[in-house]
Amino acid sequence: MAAALLMMNMHGAVMASDCDRTIFRYSEKIPFAIMVDPRSELPWEDIIMDYQAKRSISNEMSFMDCATDFRQYLTDLLKLKDSNTRKNESDKQVVCIGYDPNSIFPKASIITTAITERGFMINRPIEISNLPKSVCLQMLGNCENIRILLGGMSDDISQKIKDLFFNKISDIVGNKDSAKLIKDFGNYILEKLESIQEDTKVLEAISFFTIKDMVKMAENLIETEGLLNSNNSAISPTHEIGIVTLAEGFVYIKHSLYGA
């Protein structure tokens, strides 16, 4: 298994992962952090070290400028990789966390990689923290059990519903092209409904959490995902937990690389 999640509110952000080398800081002084998809096969520790050495961001830059700078760095880097590597990295996500100058609320954005007709692309950062008080919950990797526990549905069940919807519409319309247009609209509606049902209750609860509460919940969710995914009932330990706050910047409270 490979699962990671970001939990964030006005107090700060908490990241947790069951894999090493998935949560990174830019520097001790700048509260800017990066969490990568734990399924990615790229050497992220080397990538982040190279980014720190070659690029320069500052506290005066807006958060989205920092995220965009990292996205541009990744774009330039992956151009140098072979096609098989780029193909394997398709549909992976990178989350950036930080602060705007003179702002007390944290922000987060997500960068997604994709294979399109034009080739490999790294999409522009999309802010995911524009709700009141920066409340956010973002999952990366294999988090199907977490989604179900939090009141949503698994991707597998969701896909079966969409396929059934498409097949029935095709039978009624009798035209595949028309049915596809209706399917696309139906998918949009289903995704919005899922998002509303899954997020509303959970995000409302997260908005009241302290940093300590978020650390406990994030770690418990990651370890529960490991337990439910394991064939021998052995809990997959949480390897990394990182916290980003305005007062303390980025802090590791658990990092197996350092024996914590």
State the predicted function of each range:
Residues 1-260:
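N-terminal nucleophile
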